[in-house]
Amino acid sequence: MDTIKRMLWPKKEIFVGTFATGVERDTSVDIFQLVCRVVLRYMRTGKIENNTDSLGNFIVELLKTDCAAKWEWFMKRRRVGDYAKSLAIASIPVIPLLSYATMKKTVALRAFGNELSFNIRVPRPSVPKKGLLLRLAAGLALAPICALAMYATLPREKLSVFKLRTEARAHMEDEREATDCLVVEPARELKGKDGEDLLTGSRMTKVIASTGRPRRRPYAAKIAQVARAKVGYLKNTPENRLIYQRVMIEIMDKDCVRYVDRDVILPLAIGCCFVYPDGVEESAALWGSDESLGVKXGGLVRLPGVVTQTNRDIPSGVLLPQEVLEVRAGPPNAKDRNIFMVAGCPSQARFLVHNHCLKNLKRGLVERVFCVERNGQLTRTPQPTKGAFGRLSPFRKAVCEKVGVAHRLGYDGFLSYYSGAKLRTYTRAVESLHITPVSERDSHLTTFVKAEKISTAKGDPAPRVIQPRNPRYNVELGRYLRHMESKLMKAVDGVFGETTCIKGYTADEVGQIFRDKWDRFNKPVAIGLDASRFDQHCSVEALQFEHGFYRAMYPGNKLLSKLLDWQLHNKGKGYVPDGTITYRKEGCRMSGDINTSLGNYLLMCAMIYGYMRHLGINEYSLANCGDDCVLIVERRNLKQIQGTLPEYFLNLGYTMKVEPPVFQLEEVEFCQAHPVQFQGGWKMVRNVRTAMSKDVHCVNNIRDLATRRAWSNAQHHGGVALTSGIPVVEKFYSRFTLYEVPKKHQRIDTVTNVHKWRGSGGDYVVTPEARASFWAAFGLTGDEQLALEDRLDRWEMDLFGEEGVDAHEPSILDSAVA
């Protein structure tokens, strides 16, 4: 109705300049889509099957399908009663041609010797000559209308069902197979237990086959062809049989094959997967021959640091009046960093490191502290709406009630949490605090460029910066928070009713946590939440909300309030060999703060808790690792979350991206790791492409022999502990040579990055189930896993020879480098 009104009485729009300002424009009506919807609704197709670009082609294609469906109904299912309405409509054009005169007819009835007679009028059709042309014209005018009406009333099944049957014939052995095996149920709407709308039938295919009937073998051959097309030709090994089995179960789930039939079809289909056409086995033997994989010994390669080629200034109007960024260039005295790589590893991914220079430091501060990029332009980070964090106060209240009132640690108690270099640093800070109390100057930031492995596949990313405060400040704040971190994590778990904060667990424990979370749901789906530069988006309001947790544990503590307020108004300096940078920033999480990890946990959990309460969804499970989150829900809630989550977080000042959902446990990615089943249960395994490319690079200076030995030992011990019983990656870490540890050696964590989760140890073997689960997680088939392991067996490290050049031969991992 609104469309008709707009066509009859169009609104007059006022245009100012090139664009209309302050004028509400109505969306244009797509006549093509409107006609398609009207026609398809009348034709009862059940869905809009619009695959063409022109209206003429669309109508022609629709009529062809409609005619074929009606002809099939007439040839196979015709009944007299189905066509009564159509025949009645077809006789309407004949009615104007006839003239109906009446004649008297006497009817006599006799009963008990008496006779009763009466006259009745009987119509007598005839074709009179008078007015014949006029009657003929009326009949001809009605003929096309009645023909269309008669065609429209001809019986047929739904076009969506007919199309499904037609497609099925292309994949079955013959038409009888498609007709007998495929039964499409009519659509019916149901209500779920939670009141949600469910649609059953309509597009659902069921395979109906009785025991002993010959339809199972052709169907088994067909799904075997589909499985080989998806996975490829694999050798007949236990792990590859499991891989084929998983693919075919997914196909039969989609086809709704009865479980009694799967018991017979599955062994037949798995056997068909290993029946190869002529020439396939010979080609596979040539592909996997040892002569085609000539691997050289792995020597140490030194790669120089890089300087960003991008130089961007902060646009005017972005900085607040109290914010400043001053750059002072000095003499060109910048020194190059180095990154060391072990050559010969079967991965083409390469990593570099940013130099500690003025150009890198400036870009890191501009793009990772002050500005975000939106539509190719630098702008200020989004700010939360007024009162947005106030709506999250029920979560904070629930957590603080579980924690209760805390007591501040003494200096010795705080120092007991540290060892090594950090212990020495904080010990000197404590000695200084005994002489001079903490002051606002201790909260000032010292900024430098992070020595991080940067993938060459990312182009020229903005360098990351580290912004620690004075150790004196960290000691005073740590006395309030360091011992309460685990208690706050447990309190958050208590509010959610399950393990939510994934911190302090082994890789095996985290894998089992995900297994338990997944089993809670009937039809689970996992959604990854990617917070773009979470630390940078922490506004003053977000930090104040976080500080409310700490203030509630220490009510009325003035020193704590003063320490926390200094985090809201940041002052920092960055010293590099070729210049200095001085800046002031309101809000923003500083990466060197002692409460960075704890604060990110609390903020993310609070926002997810408030969001799910906002939607009214009670069945969900959250795995949180700071700014990296995975949300597991029932599939019926997926669309609701995908459509509303980014806007909700934007109102809180965060740019949140909803990653594509996954429907298998192994496909869940959490902190660049996937759950993988192995002999001991479930384990979180780092992405194989990331692990085998990053862990052959080292950003520390390992030029001296003792440090090289310590680094190799750390890679071997740490990697094997994390990957015992896992295909490929266990073999990879075992190739790092073990050396005798000298009496005075560097600690492991000083020469290599600390692993995300500790290893639980244990001596496990690689099982077929582990290979199948590894394939589901990373897409490497059993044959590809064995080929990689064979290549790693022939990879020999030489960390003490002369520095070589980067040499690489193609491998399976190069197809999708992370």
UniProtKB/Swiss-Prot annotation:
Residues 524-641 form the RdRp catalytic domain. The keyword Nucleotidyltransferase applies. It catalyses: RNA(n) + a ribonucleoside 5'-triphosphate = RNA(n+1) + diphosphate. Keywords: Nucleotide-binding, Nucleotidyltransferase, RNA suppression of termination, RNA-directed RNA polymerase, Transferase, Viral RNA replication. It comes from the Viruses. Its EC number is 2.7.7.48. GO terms for molecular function: nucleotide binding; RNA binding; RNA-directed RNA polymerase activity. GO terms for biological process: viral RNA genome replication. It holds the Pfam family Tombus_P33. It is an enzyme of class 2 (transferase). Belongs to the tombusviridae RNA polymerase family. Readthrough of the terminator UAG occurs at position 297. RNA-dependent RNA polymerase that plays an essential role in the virus replication. This is RNA-directed RNA polymerase. It comes from Cucumber necrosis virus (CNV).
